[in-house]
C-alpha cells in the first residue's frame, strides 16, 4: 500500500519500535504477509522509554513527515515501568511540537504487543493515511538536510 499524490510525493514515516513488543509485532506482521506501507522506516529501540524527544525532532528535521512510537502495553513492559516513563516524555514532546508549530497528528504513540501483528499493520496503515491527508511537513523545511 503505497500512497502517492499527484505531484509524486510519498510521506516519509519513521517508526520507533520497542525491541520486546512492537518490533516483534512488526516481525509477525511481515511473516504473516500483512501489508503496511513500504515508506514506514522502522528503527528498533531497547524500550519505548529510551526514545529521547530530540530523536523525534531530529527525524522531522531530516525530512520525516510523521513519527510514530510503538511500545509495550502499559503494565506489560519488559523493564516494568518503561512505558509509564514514555507517557511523561511524550507529553513533553507534544508540548515542544506545539511550540514549534508542528501538527500534533504527525506524531503518535501506540501500544502494540508481540502477538499483535495485525494491529501493527493496521496502525501503520492508519497512520500513513493520516500523514498523507496532512500532506508534506514543510514546517522545518529550512532546517532539513539536503539529499
Where in this protein do the model-derived segments appear?
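Iron-sulfur-associated redox domains of electron-transfer enzymes in respiratory
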Residues: 1-147
Amino acid at each position: 500500500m503505497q500512497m502517492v499524490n499527484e505531484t509524486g510525493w510519498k510521506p516519509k514515516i519513521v517508526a520507533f519500535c520497542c525491541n520486546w513488543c512492537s518490533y516483534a509485532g512488526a516481525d509477525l506482521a511481515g511473516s504473516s504477509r500483512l501489508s503496511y506501507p513500504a515508506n514506514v522506516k522502522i528503527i528498533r529501540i531497547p524500550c519505548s522509554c529510551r526514545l529521547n524527544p530530540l530523536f523525534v525532532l531530529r527525524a522531522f528535521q531530516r525530512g520525516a513527515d510523521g513519527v510514530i512510537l510503538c511500545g509495550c502495553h502499559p503494565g506489560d513492559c519488559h523493564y516494568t515501568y518503561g512505558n509509564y516513563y514514555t507517557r511523561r516524555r511524550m507529553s513533553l514532546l507534544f508540548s515542544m511540537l506545539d511550540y514549534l508549530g508542528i501538527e500534533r497528528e504527525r506524531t503518535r504513540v501506540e501500544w502494540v504487543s508481540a502477538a499483535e501483528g495485525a494491529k501493527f499493520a493496521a496502525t501503520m496503515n492508519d497512520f500513513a493515511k493520516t500523514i498523507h491527508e496532512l500532506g508534506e511537513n514543510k514546517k522545518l523545511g529550512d532546517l532539513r538536510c539536503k539529499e
